[in-house]
Amino acid sequence: MFREEGLAVIDADRIAREITVPGRPAYDAIVRAFGRGILLPDGRIDRKRLGNIVFSDPGKRAELEAITHPEIARGIASELYLLESEGRNVAIVEAALILETGRRARFEAVIAVRCGRDQQVRRLMERDGMSEEQILRRIDSQMDPEEKALASEHVIDNSGDVAGTRAQVRALAERIKSGDT
C-alpha cells in the first residue's frame, strides 16, 4: 500500500528469497547446515520444510538467521544505496524482524502493523497454506505484538477492512513524504 502512495518499498522477504536460490552463498551455507533433505527435486530450498525445522528448534533458527540476516542486511543496504543514487531519500523497508535483529538504529522510524492473533493466524493459513500449529510456532518465535507496537513510532491497525487500513497507510505516507516521521 505504501508503494501505491508513491513511496519506495524494499521487501526483506523478497531479498531473503533471492539470496537463497541455488548458486548464491547463503544457499550453499544453508544446505551445508541443514542437509540436502531440505531441497526440492529441482534443487531449490523447500521453504516450508526448512521453516518446520527452524521454528521447532530455537538453535536451528539462530543458525539460519546467522546465515541469512547479514546477507539480507547487505541486500537492503544495496537497494537503499540505489534509491539514494536516484534521488529518492525515503524508503519503507518491509521486514518483520527489524526490532528482533538489533537493526533498529539503522532506521529513522519503525512502523508496526498489527491485528488480533486469531485474525493473523487465519490470514496466514489462507495465504501460506500452513497448519495452525506451524503458524503459531512462527508467531510465537517473534517479539510480542504489544511490545513491538510500543517500540515503534507508528502503528497501523490491520484488524479492520482494507479501506480502513488503506486510509491509515495513506495518512502515514503523507506524513512521511512531508518529512514528519
Identify the residue ranges that each predicted region occupies.
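Residue-level recognition of specific faces of alpha-helices
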Residues: 1, 18, 53, 60-63, ...
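ATP-dependent small-molecule kinase phosphotransfer cores
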Residues: 14-90
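Small-molecule kinase domains that catalyze NTP-dependent phosphoryl transfer to phosphate-bearing small molecules
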Residues: 76, 104-106, 122, 126, ...
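A conserved segment at the C-terminal end of the G1
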Residues: 1-10
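Short, acidic/turn-prone active-site loops that include or flank metal/cofactor-
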Residues: 14-17, 115-118, 137-140, 162
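ATP-dependent NMP and nucleoside kinases share a basic, alpha-helical "lid"
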Residues: 77-85, 89-126
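Short beta->alpha linker loops
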Residues: 45, 67-68, 115, 140-143, ...
